[in-house]
Design a protein with these regions (language model features):
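Glycine-rich beta-alpha loop segments
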Residues: 1-39
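A generic alpha-helix structural signal
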Residues: 3, 93, 149-153
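Active-site-proximal flexible loops/turns
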Residues: 23, 47, 151
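Residue-level recognition of conserved structural "scaffold" positions that shape functional pockets
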Residues: 23-27, 91, 136
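Conserved phosphate- and dinucleotide-binding cores of soluble alpha/beta proteins
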Residues: 42-135, 141, 147-148
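Glycine-rich phosphate/pyrophosphate-binding loop and the adjoining helix
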Residues: 140-158
Length: 158
C-alpha cells in the first residue's frame, strides 16, 4: 500500500531491498509503475535484493548505506522493524537534531508498535533534557497509510 501510494504521487520508493515490509513497499511501487529502489547490505544471512527492485545498490558498510538513505530521501516512512530499522531512524533523528542534515518528515506506521518508543522518548530523554520538544514534535505516528504518505511528502512536489 505504501509503495503504490507513493507511486501514485510520482515519488520513488526506497527501501533496504529485503523481504517483508521492504519487499511489500517495493512491489507496490513497481506494480503501480513507480520507481522502486533497494539499498541492500552485504550480510552473511541476507539474500539478494527482492525481485521488485528496479534499481539495486549493494553496500558493505552500514554507515555508507545510511548516508545514502539520508542524502537521497526527502522524507521517510518507517514500518515496524528490528535493530537495523531503529539504527537508521535514530541516525536520521540525530543528524536532524544536530543540524548535520535538513529536517525531513519522519512518519512511523503502526501506533501499537511505535507508541511505546514515543512514550519512552517523552518520559526519559525529553524529561531528562537530553532532547528538546522540537526534536520529536514533528514526528507522526499513524495507522493510516494515506496520512503517512501525505505527511512524508510534505514540502516536496508530489
Amino acid at each position: 500500500a505504501v509503495g503504490a501510494a507513493l507511486a501514485a504521487r510520482d515519488v520513488a520508493t526506497m527501501t533496504g531491498g529485503g523481504p517483508g515490509a521492504m519487499e511489500a513497499a517495493n512491489r507496490g511501487a513497481h506494480e503501480a509503475g513507480g520507481m522502486s529502489v533497494g539499498l541492500s547490505i552485504e550480510l552473511p544471512f541476507e539474500e539478494e535484493p527482492n525481485p521488485w527492485v528496479d534499481i539495486a545498490l549493494r553496500f558493505r558498510y552500514f554507515f555508507v548505506r545510511k548516508a545514502m538513505f539520508s542524502w537521497y530521501s526527502n522524507g521517510a516512512i518507517a514500518m515496524p522493524g528490528g535493530f537495523g530499522t531503529l539504527d537508521e531512524l535514530y541516525e536520521q533523528l540525530t543528524l536532524m537534531q544536530t543540524r548535520k542534515t535538513e529536517k525531513v518528515p519522519l512518519v512511523f506506521v503502526g501506533k501499537d508498535y511505535w507508541g511505546g518508543m514515543f512514550d519512552w522518548m517523552r518520559s526519559a530523554p525529553l524529561s531528562y533534557g537530553y532532547i528538546s520538544p522540537e526534536d520529536i514534535d514533528g514526528l507522526l505516528v499513524t495507522d493510516d497509510v494515506e496520512k503517512a504518505v501525505a505527511a512524508a511528502c510534505a514540502g516536496i512536489e508530489c
